[in-house]
């Protein structure tokens, strides 16, 4: 089977027991562990560490959806039969028994520099940004959107279609049924905001005065500060502020 690799890139190290179906495109320098199954259409970037017993690209959990034998058969090219696949960026760490389902109307997407711990799950059509941490046994329902730099604690469950804002910290065992605000600390069942993620803001390089200026916006009681934010953070929070209030 063909597993495309960019010309001149570092070699991929794939355990002989791993199963990669047709339509799986790899960048370079990836490690893929024992008994992992990846079925196309899937596109994976560079320098990812994918541990043992990981599944990527299997069909979304839809009773009426197709369940092709994609580890044996090549994709047909028809999304109605193949699904819309998975796109994974670079430098992610995907630990044992994690899973990513393919999309049903768009590709399920994982960004760069994320850490998916043991048993975490990304449902169909989900979008996960960059530098996201999903602790052990975090479950993301279909169509969820986790923005960059969010950190979801062990055993958190996110309902289908819910959104987690950038830099949010969700405490372990939480049940998220609706939107979680940017840079909030949220915990419980049902999950509710309990404070501001000061640690997350300080790790983004903000001094105390800038954190204080941003806090009313985080709490939903003020506007974004006009200046004082690093360019990358400013771009991120402005995008969150301008997000559509409803998603698919």
Each predicted region: which residue ranges?
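Conserved beta-strand-loop-alpha-helix hinge in the C-terminal portion
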Residues: 184-206
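Short, low-complexity, intrinsically disordered N-terminal peptides in bacterial proteins
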Residues: 1-11, 246-248
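Structural signal for interior beta-strand "rungs" in well-ordered beta-sheet cores
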Residues: 7-192
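Interhelical loop and adjacent transmembrane-helix boundary motif
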Residues: 218-221
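Short, amphipathic C-terminal "tail helix"
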Residues: 227-248
